[in-house]
From Swiss-Prot:
Main EC class the enzyme belongs to: transferase
Keywords noted in UniProt: ATP-binding, Cobalt, Cytoplasm, Magnesium, Metal-binding, Nucleotide-binding, One-carbon metabolism, Potassium, Transferase
Protein name, per record: S-adenosylmethionine synthase 3
Tissue and organ expression note: Mostly expressed in flowers, seedpods and roots, and, to a lower extent, in stems and leaves.
Pathway: Amino-acid biosynthesis; S-adenosyl-L-methionine biosynthesis; S-adenosyl-L-methionine from L-methionine: step 1/1
Organism: Brassica juncea (Indian mustard)
Binding site for K(+): E43
Amino acid sequence: METFLFTSESVNEGHPDKLCDQISDAVLDACLEQDPDSKVACETCTKTNMVMVFGEITTKATVDYEKIVRDTCRSIGFISDDVGLDADKCKVLVNIEQQSPDIAQGVHGHFTKRPEDIGAGDQGHMFGYATDETPELMPLSHVLATKIGAKLTEVRKNGTCRWLRPNGKTQVTGEYYNDNGAMVPVRVHTVLISTQHDETVTNDEIARDLKEHVIKPIIPEKYLDDKTIFHLNPSGRFVIGGPHGDAGLTGRKIIIDTYGGWGAHGGGAFSGKDPTKVDRSGAYIVRQAAKSVVANGMARRALVQVSYAIGVPEPLSVFVDTYGTGLIPDKEILKIVKESFDFRPGMMTINLDLKRGGNGRFLKTAAYGHFGRDDPDFTWEVVKPLKWDKPQA
């Protein structure tokens, strides 16, 4: 059996770039909660002792941006300079303006357009992907890297590993074989964890705790063997972390947010963007389409692309590739997808209920992935029943 190696990485919520994603989406939640028609394009950047939120926001909501920044930093665990940032003492800069009236007129007709006539907020192309290798219909390498990162945060916050600090990165290399286009995981080849820690812990203790409390509960035994390689804090020391260690910026972890390098990516980030931004809503609808194709048994693996022009409601193109795993031709699957999903931005917003913010809805998406999550707020993960005729054996 000929196999190959494929690697996916993740970062947890204390990584500076992810901190910025979470602040941007916390701002989005706050705006949408009070005004579902808010137009939000909120960026965040951070470095030692400083967080800045900036961008274009048009909303009737009353939003305390500084409070959102401090609350988000605090909830992640940035409560002192020792861990990389002090939520209560850091400088918070705000530079937010209104959305350009040119964009507002072209896209929304200043709110005079019907939902089906609302144009895309920008040009671009987005991809959705699904694969039958996990129950989530997501790539195993990505799922494991993401869940290990989430587990790191869990054992830090519940006190299991008191030496942990907020910043951390994970990476999983899977060994696969190609079953006529479908991806079949054979084993986990390598697990890499680099996590921020305090001064009190030794490298041996770090390795022991990570294996026992983080890796063991997450990676199924069937994927581990005596040849699996573990790199646990291979650099030896990671005390300085968070914004003190590295600058952070919204939208720099787009592969971690999606499919871990599998499928494809159009390049647009998600966090801090309201649903008129097709970078986000378009990527959500094509994930639902790809997932529905696989979940309905039409293919074992699927990639769906959609593209847009600014101000134009109808997509310019829709594309489907099942990598040779389709039970019917891709052109027939494409026809079913186009008949079953409404790719117009205004309709995607309604069908996926994307104007509903608050309760940390979009904040949740900003760490540990936007896809493959079992959460009713992730409406794009709901499988749509598709009508198709299975070929006779």
